[in-house]
Curated annotation (Swiss-Prot):
Pfam families, per database record: IRK, IRK_C
Organism the protein comes from: Mus musculus (Mouse)
Gene Ontology CC: inward rectifier potassium channel complex; parallel fiber to Purkinje cell synapse; presynaptic membrane
Tissues in which the UniProt entry reports expression: Expressed mainly in the brain, some expression in the skeletal muscle.
Keyword Transmembrane: yes
The protein's name: G protein-activated inward rectifier potassium channel 3
Subunit-level organization: Associates with KCNJ3/GIRK1 to form a G-protein-activated heteromultimer pore-forming unit. Interacts (via PDZ-binding motif) with SNX27 (via PDZ domain); the interaction is required when endocytosed to prevent degradation in lysosomes and promote recycling to the plasma membrane.
Residue intervals annotated with topology Cytoplasmic: 1-57, 157-393
Cellular localization per UniProt: Membrane
Residue window of motif Selectivity filter: 120-125
Recorded topology in the membrane: Multi-pass membrane protein
Intramembrane runs of residues: 107-118, 119-125
Function of the molecule: Inward rectifier potassium channels are characterized by a greater tendency to allow potassium to flow into the cell rather than out of it. Their voltage dependence is regulated by the concentration of extracellular potassium; as external potassium is raised, the voltage range of the channel opening shifts to more positive voltages. The inward rectification is mainly due to the blockage of outward current by internal magnesium. This receptor is controlled by G proteins. Unable to produce channel activity when expressed alone. Forms a functional channel in association with KCNJ3/GIRK1.
Length: 393
């Protein structure tokens, strides 16, 4: 609640209107989208490996157990059928009879022999003889198929274990985004950090604005995506993420927030999705971390608290202050109005020396121009920074 009050200026007529907007991307990076009424489910089977990797762990383990158990049962049944078809089960006590598999006296024995064959743990007193060509062919088929099942299932488990999803959990985003002046220009900023000592290689950052819009033809687009520039043209989107960094989106004429003042921003309805990508240094696999900011998570007139201090021979990062912000003097007008006010201020500096005739005309029109001047001053004052405050969030 303190954060919400800090974002509200006492000079405003009313606090920002709260909304129950449904997130498109959760704060932990999960995409809040479910695929429904998928009729062509056979497409999942065409990419069975990815389907198994994407399954939940309990389902993956269940499939892992079933894959081995069913193959053992299947080949065990075939071994039993071979013994039954050859009449081996009817000559169990006949020492002169040469069976296909020695000491295979029932289905349980055939099942155990199937396990011994596929897992290559070694035969005991059950062993195949050279008088059974169909058994030799089946032995070769089970050995080949067993190797394929092992490769497939072990590969699935390895990929599932080594997925970089957990690595993304140690990439953190600030709980709020802020809007304040940087080098005299309004900027939308958020902070990212890496909790691990091993770094993300080739890290890059992207930001997208998610909001609804209506086209000139009347088409309604509920989740229209717009890129927010975070330094693609200058290379600032390529990060050396050793310590926490503040990512800045300059609100210029190409920004969708160019005409958004503080009050307009608080009344707007949007979601900012931020995406951090890079390669895990230990494995070389691509990792992606995501987060998002709703309207009430964007603090106007705030700046992030510094978390980096210089100690004896090293820099120390204090993650206890990672999400903290503090208020700074920031204009409440839009970036466009701020640029226009700055342009008018620069124009006064280069005003030419008027002639006597111009002075006379100005004296005659002094009364008429007073009202317009007051209006311009009011407009300019709307872009002045608010009183400085030291309250922290």
């Amino acid at each position: 609640m303190a954060q919400e009050n800090a974002a509200f200026s006492p000079g405003s007529e009313e606090p920002p209107r709260r909304r129950g907007r449904q997130r498109y991307v959760e704060k932990d990076g999960r995409c809040n989208v479910q695929q429904g009424n998928v009729r062509e489910t056979y497409r999942y089977l065409t990419d069975l490996f990815t389907t198994l990797v994407d399954l939940q762990w309990r389902l993956s383990l269940l499939f892992f157990v079933l894959a081995y158990a069913l193959t053992w049962l299947f080949f065990g049944a075939i071994w039993w059928l071979i013994a039954y078809g050859r009449g081996d089960l009817e000559h169990l006590e006949d020492t002169a009879w040469t069976p296909c598999v020695n000491n295979l006296n029932g289905f349980v024995a055939a099942f155990l022999f199937s396990i011994e064959t596929e897992t290559t743990i070694g035969y005991g007193h059950r062993v195949i003889t050279d008088q059974c060509p169909e058994g030799i062919v089946l032995l070769l088929l089970q050995a080949i198929l067993g190797s394929m099942v092992n490769a497939f299932m072990v590969g699935c488990m390895f990929v599932k274990i080594s997925q970089p999803n957990k690595r993304a959990a140690t990439l953190v985003f600030s709980s709020h985004a802020v809007v304040s002046l940087r080098d005299g220009r309004l900027c939308l900023m958020f902070r990212v950090g890496d909790l691990r000592s091993s770094h993300i290689v080739e890290a890059s950052i992207r930001a997208k604005l998610i909001r609804s819009r209506q086209t000139l033809e009347g088409e309604f687009i509920p989740l229209h995506q717009t890129d927010l520039s975070v330094g693609f043209d200058t290379g600032d989107d390529r990060l050396f993420l050793v310590s926490p960094l503040v990512i800045s989106h300059e609100i210029d004429a190409a920004s969708p927030f160019w005409e958004a003042s503080r009050r307009a921003l608080e009344r707007d309805d949007f979601e900012i999705v931020v995406i951090l990508e890079g390669m895990v240094e230990a494995t070389g696999m691509t990792c992606q971390a995501r987060s998002s900011y709703l309207v009430d998570e964007v603090l106007w007139g705030h700046r992030f608290t510094s978390v980096l201090t210089l100690e004896d021979g090293f820099y120390e990062v204090d993650y206890a202050s990672f999400h903290e912000t503090f208020e700074v003097p920031t204009p409440s007008c839009s970036a466009r109005e701020l640029a226009e006010a700055a342009a008018r201020l620069d124009a006064h500096l280069y005003w030419s020396i008027p002639s006597r005739l111009d002075e006379k005309v100005e004296e005659e029109g002094a009364g008429e121009g007073a009202g317009a001047g007051d209006g311009a001053d009011k407009e300019h004052n709307g872009c002045l920074p608010p009183p400085e405050s030291e309250s922290k969030v």
